[in-house]
């Protein structure tokens, strides 16, 4: 699957593996992911895989666009499988000793347990070998030093995240990383320390916090053998202590300098991401980075539509790669079709993935048309299990009601979306439904627009009417067309002949 530069949208209905997609990237390249997550358990592996039989989980990551970039070359140069292409592979497979025992027939397939497996990360290898053709006992590429991954920054923002806690804790706070990246001059640091020392002396000298009573009580309990002098004050200040003590304070029309804990969850998420953006920008400007990526899961989880859109536009403007998962119809209309990666359930065990913009049947003008047409309503077709395209609002309201009343079919419960295109330009939409773009079923329903001759043979001038669309030519393995006008014509002729 080709992931474009800039901002990529992983699109799909629930339970299509969008979160797994991000986790797969992290398994390969995120040095901050704890090793315990890399040691898979049976629940992490597809239910059709029997780990008692020798098998593997393999995730391949290919990296391009690093040639001529010093820091990137230093990181991925040894991972190249050919000039300009580096390959990184996460594998969870039987341990080397187990593979050797199986080869020597000292152990039998069908007897393996979870403890017989381990994870490894390798790089390079033969570029002509397709990752799908690598078997569990094939040795491909060479091991990497795990510490090398630390120079490539991966930030993962889950959908249900406690950003308030992260902003408060020094270890997880992006604010601390941002201040560190600002490289404050030592002279400026010393000025801040002098100001803090002066304040400490005033605090320690205040009569109200003298420690005489505590000192006297301590002497009574310990006796002279363990006596120590006690005073109250602040420890010797350090610049790191200043950074740890810094807190974000917010001000709006109603309140002044309040803590983020008094703020809404959605705006705190935007605040957190804003600090990250600034940190990434500083990191890139210093040219010390070997790369960075933000993995953002469902930004719509905490944000209303306007904030979703502003956050997405901010991501698009950033000079680094970002990948977000979404099922928001407020985000998808504003994303370029080239940024779509669509995950679709087709009924088979595997989820189908596709990049519609790579479909050779779509030319540039048709891609532009689709980007213009796919507004918040029409982009529902990206998330539906099946799709019915209709001309306008009449069909949009009547067809669901008729099907429910006559056939007892609830389209929503069947995962079927009716999409009005407000016209008869079905051809561009129909091209989307294929094994390359959207591998899901689509029905095109056109209404009974009659020519004058269908009602009265004496009417002239119908040659000036536009030709009706040739719907049958749009049909393929995924698209079927239903033209109501055929039935209406037949019935009207029967009426005239009666």
Residues covered by each model-derived region:
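Glycine-rich phosphate-binding loops of NTPases
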Residues: 35-51, 67-193, 258, 464-491
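Switch/communication elements of ASCE P-loop NTPase nucleotide-binding domains
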Residues: 1-30, 248-377, 396-397
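Flexible phosphate/Mg2+-sensing switch loops adjacent to catalytic phosphate-binding sites
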Residues: 30-55, 281-289, 323, 348-350, ...
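Extended helical coiled-coil dimerization/tether regions that scaffold
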Residues: 166-169, 176-271, 275-294, 453-454
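Hydrophobic positions in the central parallel beta-sheet of the AAA+
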Residues: 155, 294-296, 388
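Acidic, divalent-metal-binding catalytic cores of TOPRIM
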Residues: 344-498
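Conserved catalytic network of the ASCE P-loop NTPase/AAA+ motor domain
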Residues: 50-54, 80-83, 146-150, 265, ...
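Extreme N-terminal "head/tail" segments of very large remodeling/mechanoenzyme assemblies
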Residues: 1-14, 23-69
């Amino acid at each position: 699957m080709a992931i474009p530069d800039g901002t990529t949208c992983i699109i799909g209905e629930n339970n299509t593996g969008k979160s797994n997609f991000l986790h797969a990237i992290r398994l390969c390249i995120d040095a901050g992911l704890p090793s315990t997550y890399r040691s898979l358990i049976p629940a992490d592996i597809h239910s059709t895989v029997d780990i008692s039989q020798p098998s593997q989980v393999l995730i391949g990551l290919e990296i391009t666009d690093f040639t001529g970039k010093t820091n990137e070359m230093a990181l991925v140069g040894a991972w190249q499988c050919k000039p300009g292409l580096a390959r990184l592979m996460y594998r969870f497979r039987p341990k080397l000793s187990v593979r050797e025992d199986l080869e020597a027939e000292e152990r039998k397939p069908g007897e393996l347990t979870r403890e017989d497996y381990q994870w490894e990360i390798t790089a390079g290898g033969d570029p002509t070998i397709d990752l799908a053709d690598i078997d569990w006992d094939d040795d491909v590429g060479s091991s990497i030093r795990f510490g090398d991954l630390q120079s490539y920054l991966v930030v993962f923002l889950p959908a249900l995240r406690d950003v308030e806690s992260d902003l408060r804790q020094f270890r997880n706070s992006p604010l601390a990383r941002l201040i560190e990246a600002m490289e404050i001059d030592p002279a400026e640091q010393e000025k801040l320390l002098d100001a803090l020392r002066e304040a400490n002396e005033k605090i320690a000298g205040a009569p109200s916090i003298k420690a005489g009573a505590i000192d006297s009580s301590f002497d009574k309990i310990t006796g002279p053998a363990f006596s120590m002098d006690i005073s109250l004050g602040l420890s010797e200040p350090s610049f790191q202590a200043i950074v740890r003590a810094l807190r974000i304070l917010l001000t709006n029309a109603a309140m002044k300098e309040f803590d983020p804990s008094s703020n809404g969850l959605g705006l705190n998420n935007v605040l957190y991401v804003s600090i990250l953006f600034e940190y990434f920008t500083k990191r890139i400007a210093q040219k010390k980075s070997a790369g960075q990526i933000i993995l953002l899961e469902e930004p719509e989880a905490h944000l209303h539509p306007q904030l979703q859109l502003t956050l997405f536009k901010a991501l698009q403007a950033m000079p680094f790669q970002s990948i977000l998962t979404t099922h928001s119809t407020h985000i998808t209309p504003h994303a370029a079709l080239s940024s779509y990666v669509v995950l679709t359930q087709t009924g088979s065990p595997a989820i189908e993935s596709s990049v519609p913009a790579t479909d050779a049947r779509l030319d540039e003008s048709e891609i532009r048309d689709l980007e213009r047409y796919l507004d918040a309503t029409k982009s529902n077709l990206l998330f539906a299990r099946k799709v019915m395209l209709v001309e306008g609002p009449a069909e949009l309201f009547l067809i669901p009601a008729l099907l429910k009343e006559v056939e007892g079919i609830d389209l929503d419960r069947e995962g079927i979306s009716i999409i009005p295109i407000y016209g008869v330009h079905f051809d561009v939409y129909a091209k989307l439904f294929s094994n390359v773009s959207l591998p899901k079923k689509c029905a095109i329903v056109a209404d009974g627009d009659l020519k004058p001759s269908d009602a009265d043979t004496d009417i002239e001038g119908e040659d000036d009417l536009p030709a009706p669309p040739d719907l049958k030519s749009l049909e393929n393995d995924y698209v079927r067309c239903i033209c109501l006008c055929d039935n209406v014509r037949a019935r009207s002729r029967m009426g005239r002949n009666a």
